[in-house]
Amino acid sequence: MENDKGQLVELYVPRKCSATNRIIKADDHASVQINVAKVDEEGRAIPGEYVTYALSGYVRSRGESDDSLNRLAQNDGLLKNVWSYSR
């Protein structure tokens, strides 16, 4: 689709689930997008710096969202020493 200036404009940009890498459909009303702020040495949030995670309704309905969020945050270096059942 084009706007009045002739630029291509997409009406819908699909997201992918951060945990399963599946595309989140437009009618998945149980999906969430979570922003986790990066913090400095004093534990204060750094303005404008965050990591975004999208979790599908499938992951949430299976009760795996908390473990998936912990795993993703550990892989990105945001969490340390979190106990996991899978280890």
From Swiss-Prot:
PROSITE patterns: RIBOSOMAL_S21E (PS00996). One of its GO terms (biological process) is endonucleolytic cleavage in ITS1 to separate SSU-rRNA from 5.8S rRNA and LSU-rRNA from tricistronic rRNA transcript (SSU-rRNA, 5.8S rRNA, LSU-rRNA). One of its GO terms (molecular function) is structural constituent of ribosome. Coiled coil: none annotated. N-terminally acetylated by acetyltransferase NatB. InterPro entries: Ribosomal_eS21 (IPR001931), Ribosomal_eS21_CS (IPR018279), Ribosomal_eS21_sf (IPR038579). The keyword Cytoplasm applies. Component of the small ribosomal subunit (SSU). Mature yeast ribosomes consist of a small (40S) and a large (60S) subunit. The 40S small subunit contains 1 molecule of ribosomal RNA (18S rRNA) and 33 different proteins (encoded by 57 genes). The large 60S subunit contains 3 rRNA molecules (25S, 5.8S and 5S rRNA) and 46 different proteins (encoded by 81 genes). Belongs to the eukaryotic ribosomal protein eS21 family. This is Small ribosomal subunit protein eS21A. It comes from Saccharomyces cerevisiae (strain ATCC 204508 / S288c) (Baker's yeast).
